[in-house]
Amino acid sequence: ITLDHPPLNSVSKRMMVEMMRALDEFEQNDVVRAIMVKANGPDFSYGADGGDVKKGINGEAEEISESFSVLGNRLVERIDCCPKPTLVAAKGRCIGGSTAMFNAFDIRIVGEGFRMHDGDIYYGTVGSWGMSSLRLPMWIGRNKVLDYMFLNEDFTGRQCYELGLASEVVADELVEVVGLATAKKMSKA
């Protein structure tokens, strides 16, 4: 699966629905033994598509934002509970809701230039997909999350690896190659 929503690979409602359809297809296909997700362009994803979140400012924005959040949570849960092994090969920036999506994969290969940043922390909002407030403390511990939140810093690819948020760090130009090789290994396991 390739994220391809230029210029920033923003996560739109359409992208989420298409990803869930692809996951459904792959799960039903006995030939598919592992599922890999990558992104077109220099960055994995800049998170939620502002246009999808803000549509209908005149009274319906809250409802649309809520439905966007519900769909995002469903996608993250869908990836996390996929019965087939999943892998993400990511480089560049990974911001906001895409951090929750990224961390839902079983295996996470990142480039040396990878940067993960929770946009909700920057804007002072509660993470709609549960990344900073729910999932991250379970994985890296409360104190590290507080550092991340209060200092508003990115996690580098190396830090993600050291904290267990990434399975492997490779040169940016090798992310997809290593991801594909790893997916092939996964499909034989």
Outline where the language-model segments fall.
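Hydrophobic/aromatic residues within transmembrane alpha-helices
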Residues: V37, D49, M101-N103, C160
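Alpha-helical segments flanking ligand/cofactor-binding loops in enzyme cores
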Residues: E77, T99-A100, L134, L146, ...
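Well-ordered beta-strand positions
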Residues: D106-I107, D147, L151-E153, Q159, ...
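Hydrophobic, secondary-structure "cap" segments at the distal end of domains
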Residues: S133-N143
